[in-house]
Design a protein with these regions (language model features):
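Positively charged n-region of N-terminal signal peptides that target proteins for export
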Residues: 1-4
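Glycine- and acidic/polar-rich repeat regions and solenoidal domains
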Residues: 295-298, 316-327, 337-612, 642-644
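Acidic, glycine-rich calcium-binding repeat modules characteristic of RTX/beta-roll
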Residues: 52-54, 61, 331, 410, ...
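Hydrophobic h-region of N-terminal signal peptides that target proteins for export
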Residues: 6-18
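Charged, alpha-helical scaffolding/interaction elements associated with membrane systems
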Residues: 37-40, 313, 337
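Extracellular polysaccharide-degrading/modifying enzymes targeting complex plant/algal/animal polysaccharides
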Residues: 24-26, 32-33, 37-300, 306, ...
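Surface-exposed extracellular loop regions of Gram-negative outer-membrane beta-barrel proteins
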Residues: 305-311, 468
Length: 648
């Protein structure tokens, strides 16, 4: 017998009463009580309102349960009355000071270590939009052209002295009352590593000394276009609407609210908002999750757990984590945006024993997910074996859309654009540096409008990684070669279409034989994590490949691809064993010839992409609008529909 628990009437009446403020403790207790009492077959429906948490909402060991938000908001923050803001003397016109002694407060912390990440500091949100730390200079980062002390590097243990010192020429920092409130932020050596380290002191000779190690030290490559820096969190630099500065020691903040701001929130909670542990056939639907320093949803040891139609935003870390112990768990139809350090961490499956996870992210819109960290903090990072990303849209990101690690992963029907907008040597879809990462399938995606002055790809097989099949994709308007095979083997590209490129479409190199030879031991070592009879049997080509010369690219296939209006089809094809039937054309009927049963229509003098790319009995990829004119598109198959819409 199924029961429906209407939480707003039974347990949460305070949220619908005339004087309710959405902060009643008994409301959250009631929600927890409803979950505890639920039996298989129940549905819990929450009334509209804001449920403010001080600790994680835990759903443990439940079976066959639906929890429906119906617009309910789960918040890890506090609302701050504007009457608490006072004029900030000595600061810019419009700046206000806020005393935060009554609130739990976390100060700004070091960010940028690719191996360590965690909750953000306490952030402010004005009318639902994140505010940003004050920045100097306002006109953008400064070139790193004067390094006094290089400092040691955290990752490669670069030789150097201490934490590093850089010089500046402006007199403006001399006006700051306390420079040690500031944080140095920027790319201090390589363009793929953006960091934040505290200022330990400002020296008399116009210098800043860092208070922590950076990843690679300062200024090893003077003149590199990515070596740039700025200072964040100085109170005197709160000069533009939407900026703030935070002083955890005095528990105060200086803010300049956007014009017309009606609601101010501050993130407080550090733990995940919702944890689903050991659940089976549980659905969480229709919630808005926001204003937390940590993660939104964490799913552990679940079976058939689904997060559906949720808006997750304003978090200091990631929207959702699905760990390796889950099976058939995922997100569907969710909108993930304004996130601190990535969208979804999608794990699952057993690589050593070759057991699929079948976890997924499908039909989701994921954007603006690098507010705080961007180095390998991506829209979705995949790990494990046998998981998929289907029918998702990724855009407006400083970093990658997808980091594909592990085995037998699938990325399909996705719309990927305007990503990698502020990073170097990356790819919209990226994987690298492991001979064990194999079996990836990248099919029927649309990569487009990645036009930046940096060295980024649409699909990047980095540092010898390979064993992937890439087909049916469309690549359009990308400023660097959309595809790079960086020394890998067993990569098969077929039936892809490349359009409107000012560069070569595909680049293949043999870096493991030359400048990247030092990667080979690292790549070989990656096998030990999955060394088992089951793994070797599943990938029979791997053993002879490793017993030969794995540094030599081999068994790469580039066939049946189409190129139209590109500078060149291939930058280098020396390391391709099979290379034929690649059609390089600029004529209007090239789609007809490439895809025999595809219907091509003229739209406003341009070309519509074919209805099927390539034709298949199981799936259909429908491009609804004229991709030549840069329009949006939709994608359909028998199970999935992509959700399109404007950025929020």
């Amino acid at each position: 017998m199924k029961r429906i628990i209407i939480a707003s009437f039974i347990l949460f009446l305070a949220l619908t009463s005339a004087n309710a403020r959405g902060v009643k403790v008994r409301s959250v207790k009631g929600l927890r009580r409803a979950i505890e009492r639920a039996v298989p077959g129940d549905t819990i429906v929450l009334g509209k309102g804001t449920y403010r948490l001080k600790e994680s909402l835990r759903i443990e060991g439940k079976t066959d349960l639906a929890i429906i938000g119906d617009g309910a908001i789960i918040s890890g923050g506090v609302r701050i009355g504007r009457w608490r803001l006072r004029k900030a003397s000595g600061m810019a016109e419009g700046a206000r000071r806020l005393n935060l002694k009554r609130y739990p407060l976390s100060g700004v912390v070091t960010k940028g270590d690719p191996h360590l990440t965690g909750p953000s500091w306490s952030e402010f949100f004005a009318d639902g939009r994140s505010m940003r730390l004050s920045e100097w200079p306002d006109g953008g980062p400064l070139p790193l052209d004067s390094v006094v002390v290089r400092g040691q590097g955290r990752i490669r243990n670069q030789p150097g002295d201490g934490f590093g010192t850089i010089a500046f020429s402006s007199d403006r920092p001399l006006e700051w009352k306390d420079p040690t409130l500031g944080w140095l932020s920027g790319c201090f050596r390589f363009g793929w590593t953006n960091e934040m380290v505290p200022i330990a002191e400002m020296g008399p000779g116009k210098t800043f000394t860092a208070g922590d190690l950076t990843n690679y030290g300062f200024g090893f490559q003077p003149g590199d276009r990515f070596q740039r820096w700025r200072v964040l969190n100085i109170p005197e630099e709160v000069t533009l609407p939407g900026e703030y500065s935070l002083d955890a020691s005095s528990k105060t903040a200086v803010l300049m609210l956007p014009e017309g701001c009606k609601r101010l929130e501050m993130s407080v909670m550090e733990d995940p908002l919702i944890v689903l542990d050991g659940c089976e056939k549980v659905t969480l639907q229709g919630f808005e999750l926001c204003y937390s320093r940590g993660d939104g949803i964490v799913i552990t040891a679940g079976r058939d757990v689904q997060v559906k139609d949720c808006d997750i935003h304003g978090l200091g870390h990631v929207a959702a984590k699905i760990d390796s112990a889950n099976l058939r768990c995922g997100l569907s139809g969710c909108h993930l945006y304004d996130l601190g350090a990535g969208g979804v961490e999608l794990a699952g499956g057993d690589r050593r024993n070759v057991v699929r996870g079948d976890n997924y992210v499908e039909g989701c819109r994921i954007h603006n997910y690098n507010r705080i960290e961007n180095q390998y903090r991506v829209g979705v990072v995949m790990s494990g074996l046998g998981n998929r990303i289907t029918a998702c849209e990724f855009y407006d990101s400083a970093s990658m859309a997808i980091l594909m690690l592990g085995n037998d992963q699938t990325v399909e029907y996705c719309n990927v654009h305007h990503v990698c907008m502020d990073i170097e040597d990356n790819g919209a879809l990226y994987y690298g540096r492991s001979f064990a990462h194999r079996g990836g399938v990248i099919r029927w995606n649309y990569f487009h409008d990645i036009e930046v002055p940096f060295n980024v790809r649409a699909v990047y097989h980095d540092d010898g990684s390979g064993a992937a099949e890439v087909y049916g994709n469309v690549f359009q308007r990308i400023s660097s070669p959309p595809v790079q095979i960086g020394g890998g083997s067993y990569i098969r590209y077929h039936d892809n279409t490349f359009i409107d490129l000012p560069c070569a479409a595909i680049k293949v190199d043999g870096r493991l034989k030359t400048w990247g030879a030092d990667r080979v031991p690292i790549m070989r070592d990656s096998i030990r994590h999955v060394d088992s009879p089951a793994f070797w049997e599943h990938y029979p080509e791997l053993e002879p490949y490793l017993n030969g010369d794995p540094a030599e690219p081999q068994h790469n296939t580039l066939i049946n691809n189409v190129f139209c209006n590109v500078a060149a089809a291939f930058e280098k094809v020396v390391w391709s064993d099979h290379f034929y039937n690649n059609d390089i054309e600029g004529r209007a009927n090239f789609f007809d010839e490439m895809h025999g049963n595809s219907k091509v229509e003229k739209l406003d003098g341009g070309l519509a992409l074919p209805e099927r790319v390539p034709p298949t009995s199981q799936h259909e990829l429908h491009f609804i609008h004229d991709a030549f004119n840069g329009a949006q598109y939709g994608i359909l198959d028998e199970r999935h529909t992509a959700a399109n819409g404007n950025s929020q």
